[in-house]
């Protein structure tokens, strides 16, 4: 009797083991939007930035304007972008590009509110707060050069980030032009 029970129990255990050992394949269909597709177990996230040909088109998408200098650090090639998170947070960005390598010399951000929207988490050796056109501007940098300027004005947060750093007087002049 025991021998009769051992065979069916062993067969059931082997079938269970084989069924459990099968790896689940991700379900990717052509009807699934790109942001929801799963490839190799990871979800692909779309680029949140939308590029625009002109400052006016970007301002229309953002719902507010951003006035910037003509050039920063010798770069006048600009890319206008807007990021709309969908929860009411909108960031208007102007990138000043350095060339074909896709690097940028500087960027300017503007968004509603008073939060730090720089996205720059570097530790700077020097931090100073100055008055520029009746705005309290925090400048951060290293070795006597300023890389980052942050301020708020009229219910908006602003950021000017310059990759190579500028003298404090040059950064003040640029901040004065941004609205």
Segments and roles (model prediction):
Residues 1-9:
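Positively charged n-region of N-terminal signal peptides that target proteins for export
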Residues 16-19:
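C-terminal motif of bacterial Sec signal peptides marking the signal peptidase cleavage site
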Residues 21-23:
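Bacterial signal peptide processing site
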Residues 25-35:
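N-terminal hydrophobic targeting segments that direct proteins to the cell envelope
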Residues 27, 65, 174-178:
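Conserved short hydrophobic interaction patches
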Residues 36-146, 153:
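Short, solvent-exposed recognition patches
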Residues 154-179:
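Surface-exposed amphipathic alpha-helical segments
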């Amino acid at each position: 009797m025991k021998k009769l029970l051992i065979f069916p129990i062993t067969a059931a255990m082997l079938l269970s083991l084989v069924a459990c050992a099968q790896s689940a394949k991700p379900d990717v269909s052509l009807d699934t939007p790109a942001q929801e597709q799963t490839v190799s177990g990871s979800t692909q996230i779309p680029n949140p930035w939308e590029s625009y040909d002109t400052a006016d088109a970007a301002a229309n998408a953002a719902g507010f304007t951003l006035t910037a200098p003509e050039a920063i650090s010798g770069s006048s090639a600009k890319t206008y972008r807007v990021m709309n998170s969908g929860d009411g947070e909108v960031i208007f960005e102007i990138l000043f590009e350095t060339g074909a390598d896709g690097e940028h010399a500087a960027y300017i951000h503007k968004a509603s509110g008073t939060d730090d929207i720089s996205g720059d988490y570097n530790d700077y050796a020097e931090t100073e707060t100055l008055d520029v056109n009746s705005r309290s501007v925090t400048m951060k940098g290293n070795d006597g050069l300023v890389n980052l300027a942050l301020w708020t004005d009229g219910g908006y947060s602003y950021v000017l980030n310059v990759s190579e750093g500028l003298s404090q007087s040059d950064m003040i002049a640029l901040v004065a032009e941004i609205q």
